[in-house]
């Protein structure tokens, strides 16, 4: 179906606006995925703060022009689904990686984070980034373990001191 020039400009503007506010982007090939599965993906994406759109390659190239996601131009081949993470950098990568496990024909092509291209083979690095809450919990656990260890060492030093005095 041919798109009018106004429609193309609207799509480019919409995707460009999503790209400007996004933390990361993931590009995938959704050929062979059923409509029902894509609908489920879109619902899950909305719930996780991820913008998902199937875009023509030329429109996608124009939309990411001048953004941190220009490095994705090389993977804009074939049918292109682009997902932008708005709340957490790993949200889109995690979402599409999990979806690819369920759908054999769904293929992640690559991702971009802070202007750097991440090949599909390394998408786990982005998907495994902890959320803000998880990172805080890890920091608190580290601090808690460090203070507990310091307390134990202080008690051991006090014990050794008393044994030497006796």
From Swiss-Prot:
Part of the ribosomal stalk of the 50S ribosomal subunit. The N-terminus interacts with L11 and the large rRNA to form the base of the stalk. The C-terminus forms an elongated spine to which L12 dimers bind in a sequential fashion forming a multimeric L10(L12)X complex. HAMAP family: Ribosomal_uL10 (MF_00362). InterPro entries: Ribosomal_uL10, Ribosomal_uL10-like_sf, Ribosomal_uL10_bac, Ribosomal_uL10_bac_type, Ribosomal_uL10_CS_bac. This is Large ribosomal subunit protein uL10. Keywords: Ribonucleoprotein, Ribosomal protein, RNA-binding, rRNA-binding. GO terms for cellular component: large ribosomal subunit. Pfam families: Ribosomal_L10. GO terms for molecular function: large ribosomal subunit rRNA binding; structural constituent of ribosome. It comes from Shewanella amazonensis (strain ATCC BAA-1098 / SB2B). It comes from the Bacteria. One of its GO terms (biological process) is translation. Belongs to the universal ribosomal protein uL10 family. Forms part of the ribosomal stalk, playing a central role in the interaction of the ribosome with GTP-bound translation factors.
């Amino acid at each position: 179906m041919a798109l009018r020039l106004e429609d193309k400009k609207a799509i480019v503007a919409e995707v460009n606006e999503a790209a400007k506010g996004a933390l990361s982007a993931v590009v995938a090939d959704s050929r062979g995925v059923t409509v029902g599965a894509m609908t489920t993906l879109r619902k899950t994406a909305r719930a996780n703060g991820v913008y998902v759109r199937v875009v023509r390659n030329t429109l996608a190239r124009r939309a990411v022009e001048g953004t941190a996601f220009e490095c994705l131009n090389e993977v804009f081949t074939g049918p292109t689904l682009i997902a932008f993470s708005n709340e957490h950098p790993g949200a889109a990568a995690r979402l599409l990686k999990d979806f690819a496990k369920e759908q054999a024909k769904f293929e992640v092509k690559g991702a971009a984070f802070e202007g750097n291209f991440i090949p599909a083979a390394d998408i786990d690095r982005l998907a495994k980034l902890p959320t803000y809450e998880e990172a805080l919990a890890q920091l608190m656990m580290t601090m808690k373990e460090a203070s507990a260890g310091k307390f134990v060492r202080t008690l051991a030093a006090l014990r050794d001191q008393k044994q030497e005095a006796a």
